């Protein structure tokens, strides 16, 4: 491609509304242009990258024998009403009516559609297992779209769906897709982790997220330094602590704590550390109006874990202070588990404390030297807390460390959630109707592009991994308009590299060298060749890798093979 014939428009200044590096650099390099809130046009440069992502994904999906199809973006409401998600999916579901007042949504995902197709197409166990995928535009009506294409309202996803009759078959396909995702991100040159994850609104029994590691990532990931264990903050657990061996021999004592309402205030007032206290949170229960969740004072409640307890209502709902005072006759800052008279669920780390300070269920009073069993009773012990850096890994191997990541893929073992709701069954080997079970496998095509930039950039611009770069090589002829020798040599290199199937940009624009070099760094082309009169006098061209600050001279008769070897590494 010749730059003079290409739509290459870059910006020096960073747009004011671009908060993160990928958003800034995609706008400055001319990859995208904003149309509206969370809506972006992919310009020719950005589309080249997007297509490379799609091609890698498509190749690896085809290797798993998944079959590509394309489903409608607009979906009938009645399909979503069958599964109950029309009401529960929330405000991100963009709904509409046609001229006959029939309701539809613009699909944020396609579980209902694919299940409807398969319940009509599949009749026998002999047709299973099957796995279908599509690469298609989705829409989620984000209240606050931000970070460019990282959290846009319209985006492109690869979503795949598999159908099975046995858990063993589902697990086999799940493993194949998991490995395919690993190959995809390996080929893209991304540093990532596959982590255990909560199934969330999609549902199911097991899932993994694929997280591209980046300091700007919104997700917290915990991983062991001595094993393969890794999980996101919602799902991460640590080794269950042992209960104290020695009983508390100190006498429980009631003390005044005037106007001390928070854990930090109580701990400071009593001259102790916050990890010597416990806190009691009152939430709505499934069968009881109120349930108490008890954690160590320095721990944070993990709401995703909490709502998985059978006594806790989902979504999690904290009881307001006025109702607590009216019902429990205790102000919020003085609540504790002793004689509380509502179900008490205690976190394992709080239960392991030999003694603790807690609210006394009297205004401005706390107990010191309180102990479980002797003084405080509980209904169940449960993992309620967010893990912390330095916690022991749950597999007993090493300690947990924390990093940030950007979720770019998510695989689920759905089970029969959708098939059962939509009556998707086939005849099994015994001649009986059996509900199918499903897996689903999502990968954010547009998000991968932004995540790659977040991981691969510097102060000058993007540093593309070779597999994703819009062009692999940029040839810059200096003063090509005035020097026939420079022009001819640049053209010769351009044609030779093209003949070897290499994506080459010949930057033949009539611009100053500084502008051409700056644009190359901004766009992030991995390999730069500079053809100049001075270098030609030495029989060389100048080579520079985008990832390096060093330049080197390469003999003209060796430069093509030099580039080919670099690209094929």
Curated annotation (Swiss-Prot):
The keyword ATP-binding applies. Keywords: Aminoacyl-tRNA synthetase, ATP-binding, Cytoplasm, Ligase, Nucleotide-binding, Protein biosynthesis. Its EC number is 6.1.1.15. The keyword Mitochondrion does not apply. PROSITE patterns: AA_TRNA_LIGASE_II. It holds the Pfam family tRNA_edit. It is found in: Cytoplasm. It is an enzyme of class 6 (ligase). It comes from the Bacteria. One of its GO terms (cellular component) is cytosol. Belongs to the class-II aminoacyl-tRNA synthetase family. ProS type 1 subfamily. Catalyzes the attachment of proline to tRNA(Pro) in a two-step reaction: proline is first activated by ATP to form Pro-AMP and then transferred to the acceptor end of tRNA(Pro). As ProRS can inadvertently accommodate and process non-cognate amino acids such as alanine and cysteine, to avoid such errors it has two additional distinct editing activities against alanine. One activity is designated as 'pretransfer' editing and involves the tRNA(Pro)-independent hydrolysis of activated Ala-AMP. This is Proline--tRNA ligase. It comes from Legionella pneumophila subsp. pneumophila (strain Philadelphia 1 / ATCC 33152 / DSM 7513). The gene is proS.
């Amino acid at each position: 491609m010749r730059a003079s014939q290409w739509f290459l428009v870059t910006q020096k200044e960073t747009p004011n509304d671009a908060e993160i590096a990928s958003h800034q650099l995609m706008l400055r390099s001319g990859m995208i242009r904003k149309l509206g809130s969370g809506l972006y046009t992919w310009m020719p440069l950005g589309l080249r990258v997007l297509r490379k992502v799609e091609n890698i994904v498509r190749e690896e999906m085809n290797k798993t024998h998944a079959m590509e199809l394309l489903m409608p973006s607009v979906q009938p409401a009645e399909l979503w009403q069958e599964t109950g998600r029309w009401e529960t999916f929330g405000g991100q579901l963009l709904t509409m009516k046609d001229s006959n007042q029939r309701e539809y949504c613009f699909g944020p995902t396609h579980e209902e559609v694919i299940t409807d197709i398969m319940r009509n197409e599949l009749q026998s166990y002999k047709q299973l297992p099957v796995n279908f995928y599509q690469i298609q535009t989705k829409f989620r009506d984000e209240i606050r779209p931000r970070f460019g294409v990282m959290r846009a309202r319209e985006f492109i996803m690869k979503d795949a769906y598999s159908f099975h009759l046995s858990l063993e078959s589902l697990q086999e396909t799940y493993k194949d897709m998991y490995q395919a995702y690993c190959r995809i991100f390996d080929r893209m040159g991304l540093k990532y982790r596959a982590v255990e994850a909560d199934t969330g609104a999609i549902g199911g029994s097991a899932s993994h997220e694929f997280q591209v590691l980046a300091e700007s990532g919104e997700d917290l990931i915990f991983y062991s330094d001595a094993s393969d264990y890794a999980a996101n903050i919602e799902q991460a657990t640590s080794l269950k602590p042992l209960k104290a061996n020695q009983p508390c021999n100190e006498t429980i004592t009631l003390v005044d704590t005037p106007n001390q309402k928070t854990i930090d205030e109580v701990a400071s007032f009593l001259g102790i550390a916050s990890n010597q206290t416990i806190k009691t949170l009152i939430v709505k229960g499934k069968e009881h109006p109120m349930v108490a969740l008890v954690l160590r004072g320095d721990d944070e409640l993990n709401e995703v874990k909490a709502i998985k307890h059978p006594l806790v209502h989902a979504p999690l709902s904290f009881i307001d202070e006025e109702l607590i005072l009216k019902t429990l006759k205790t102000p919020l800052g003085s609540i504790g588990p002793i004689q509380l008279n509502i179900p008490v669920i205690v976190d394992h780390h709080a239960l392991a404390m030999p003694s603790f300070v807690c609210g006394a269920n009297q205004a401005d009073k706390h107990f010191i030297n309180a102990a479980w069993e002797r003084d405080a009773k509980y209904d169940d012990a449960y993992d309620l807390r967010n893990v912390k850096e330095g916690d022991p890994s749950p597999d007993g191997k090493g300690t947990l460390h924390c990093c940030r990541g950007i979720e770019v893929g998510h695989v689920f073992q759905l089970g029969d959630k959708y098939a059962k709701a939509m009556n998707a069954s086939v005849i099994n080997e015994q001649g009986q109707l059996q509900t199918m079970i499903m897996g689903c496998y999502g990968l954010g095509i547009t998000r991968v592009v932004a995540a790659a930039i977040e991981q691969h950039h510097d102060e000058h611009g993007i540093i593309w991994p070779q597999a994703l770069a819009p062009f692999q090589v940029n040839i810059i002829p200096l003063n090509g308009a005035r020097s026939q020798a420079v022009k001819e040599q640049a053209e010769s290199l351009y044609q030779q590299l093209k003949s070897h199937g290499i994506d080459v940009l010949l930057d033949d624009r009539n611009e100053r060298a500084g502008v051409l070099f700056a644009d190359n760094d901004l766009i992030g082309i991995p390999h730069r060749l500079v053809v100049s009169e001075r270098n030609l006098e030495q029989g060389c061209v100048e080579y520079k890798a985008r990832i390096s600050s060093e330049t080197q001279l390469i003999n003209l008769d060796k430069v093509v093979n030099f580039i080919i070897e670099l690209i094929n590494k």
